[in-house]
Amino acid sequence: MSRQHPTRTVAAVALAASALLASCSTQKDDDAGGGVVIESPPGVARPPYRFSARDEALLEEVQRGAFNWMWATSDPAKGVETGMCPDRTSKPTVSIAGVGFQLSGLCVGVERGWITREQGRGRAELILRSLAANPENRKAGLFYHFIDPVTAGQPADAYERVVSTIDSALLFAGVITASSYFGGDVARLGDALFRDADWRFFVAPRDAEDPQIRRFVTLGWKPEDAEAPTGKGSLLPYGWVDSGDEHRLVTFLGVCAPRETHRLDAAVYYRLRRQLGGYPGAERMVWFPWSGALFAAFFANCWIDYAGMGPDNPSAFTDLPRARVDWWENSRRTMLLHRAKAVENPLGLPGFGENGWGLSASDVEGGYAVPGLFPDALPMQALIPGSIPVRDYTEWDAKDDWGDGTIAPYAAGCCVMFDPAAAVAALRHMRGLRPGGDRSLWSDPASGGFGFQDAYNERTGWVAPDCVAIDQGPLLLAIENARTGLIWRTFHAHRFVRGGMERLGMQRTNRR
């Protein structure tokens, strides 16, 4: 349940908002779109970074642990006939989102010398052949959220049976990366799968019951009969209408579609709402009102090289009033907000502080939770004339949700792409924790261990028994991008991505 921030009064929020409105040190007004430009202040370093030998050693073992888990749990010799890693340690069912991270992670494993190129290529090819061979795992080219690890078809124990646009997007980001890296049959299989993805099929019609989602990509599709997964069904009544990382990744890949009949218009990406908020020390930012979980600031950044771009230009694609945003900088500010609020720690939760932060989707002692933190909403009509509710922003009053005080190491760790010093300090701190007294949060990768468990709670002493694919995966990729930029380079080298970038008017101007 969301909770009111106990240390903030209405007057304090108003004062903070006034200060943020007056601040223009790192953002400037721009006539295009009637909006605001969010960009980095001078002197902010961008990845890849140079790390000390000590920090490199820590990052290497964190990555190795995450890779060990994905490699060991997907071993065909142990009965995983499709070669796909499970959703979590204790559950063999596959999340296709996790497979997207896994496919990209194979590239890291080869580059780091943990597996041979032939091993990586073989595992990637097995995964893609398995996906392609079972038509009951997809509809209109996009995939069901959960699939069986042996048949790649419908699993018996999935908690939902929906074709998911975001989980398919995460899968396809990995497919494209592996295709670009390995070439050959991996590219042939992967490119064919992405070519078949019909993103337009999942767009809400102009007469959709909820006017907010009209002409935006929906969250997915559900069959009328679970026994007929490719038969009749209906789109989910929810849409990707805001500008979190998931929203942008789905829409970006839709614009990258090689078949014009399947492709989204670039304007869909720029019509996504860009609601403005702010917080002292983090300044203005675009925020997602429905989730303050930190993963919503870095999932797309695992593949899309926003660090190599500057502010975008929505006015070239839409007449709607939209701020111009450097999305890497926006994510950096979101990370600063999370860390600042952890230091403030208004509820006095044990474990939170300058090195204890990272509220995000993760396992908790009672199951699974998605806590999150939010900036203060700023007056959109004052900042961007012409803005109107619903179309351009929501009037939802989002409240900070600290959950039960559980912290997920991957959340702070992935922010190494935005603030390497803060992220490395947090990882080093968490590596040495023993929240349960006799149980460590860490298992040594040098001995085949998996690094961090999924989450921990210092108030109760609980440590998650599982590792989770969609948490281990981004940690592996984010660190690699911070160190070398490998995933960004490989993803952007693919011709489908180059085509999408051109349609979106994007350029990696910070890359040589």
What kind of feature is each model-predicted range?
Residues 21-23:
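C-terminal motif of bacterial Sec signal peptides marking the signal peptidase cleavage site
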Residues 35-512:
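Ser/Thr/Asn(+Pro)-rich, low-complexity disordered segments
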Residues 25-28:
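Bacterial signal peptide processing site
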Residues 1-13:
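Bacterial N-terminal signal peptides that target proteins for export
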